[in-house]
């Protein structure tokens, strides 16, 4: 059976100025009368949007597994007001945990999401904490008060060019922050710790990706050390996926703003490609991967077809009713610091093992000795707290030897 790539197939119509609309599934049509005759209402016909172009068929997850995993548990989500964090909160709420603890440093987004959550889930108990994952005492106070059974660690810096400018901040949030939360999960006997990672951790070319790879190494090596002596210890699992549509700072809302302003639309390179997922899709796979975990895995997801960003820009311009290059110009600005033309979900040396969900794979990665690597990581953290950028990046490169900088001032460290 032919596999359909929506962005390519629908582009055929868009390129010929044929307006494409969407309708609900047949089962969602509106009953017209008491005989249950159904009709399609005008209001149910909607213009297509870019998410429709990129979206793949609905992903099925084993909701029974996830329910057994989360029901009546105390669940903590760090970075709970972020794009991924708040969607994880919403999806977790559907499985009726005893308490959902939202840990967040940004007070305004936290306030806003709490208002929405109380309307959407009036029966669910939500607790909230304003705290910085970089502050070990704050993190411990949160664990001491709530003793979470499950932790989803979504708090992170993720902006590639900015982290090239401020590598010490990437280390302190993405590495020290992850270490603080992981260490407290062990101390307070959390059952499962789920770290949200990124495809940029694979063969990293930038500070952000390298910092996430170091965090992956820390939590995995910690688990391997603990599990040797105690098979019932906290289970650590990492989930790794690509770009998320509509997340803060992602390309789609950025292009929308540029198109609304009349252009130009800026693309870094005509050949740059990326994998995309919708936020709900990514979050649902995180939940199922967490439920599947036996401890120590790095899960990667089937991200579907990669999308050429230039094609995405052109289609978004056409969807807005304009002609690319005529009504709205596309300008190629050059790759940004730390950016590469394509992302990888796996290192070429990493093999995969299938799981019960065909969309979720286990990456077989190099294992690190905890005692050795934790010493190196602590030295890296000390450098970030007290030192300067270049020595900090140099230490990351020693921990992650495949980290080779691109379009970056740190390329000189690779010579």
Task: For every predicted segment, state its role.
Residues 5-74:
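Flexible, Lys/Arg-rich cytosolic regulatory linkers and terminal tails that connect or flank
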Residues 65-67, 221-415:
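Strand-loop microenvironment adjacent to phosphate/nucleotide-handling motifs in alpha/beta enzyme folds
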Residues 97-112:
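Conserved glycine-rich Rossmann-like NAD(P)H-binding loop of the short-chain dehydrogenase/reductase
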Residues 12, 16-20, 153, 157-217, ...:
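Conserved Rossmann-fold NAD(P)-dependent oxidoreductase catalytic core, especially the SDR/UDP-sugar
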Residues 1, 97-98, 143, 147-152, ...:
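Proline-aspartate-enriched helix->loop->beta-strand connector
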Residues 75-93:
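N-terminal Rossmann NAD(P)H-binding glycine-rich loop of SDR-like oxidoreductase domains
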Residues 129-130, 172, 332:
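Conserved residues in the N-terminal Rossmann fold of short-chain dehydrogenase/reductase
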Residues 130-150, 338:
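Conserved Rossmann-fold cofactor-binding substructure of NAD(P)-dependent oxidoreductases
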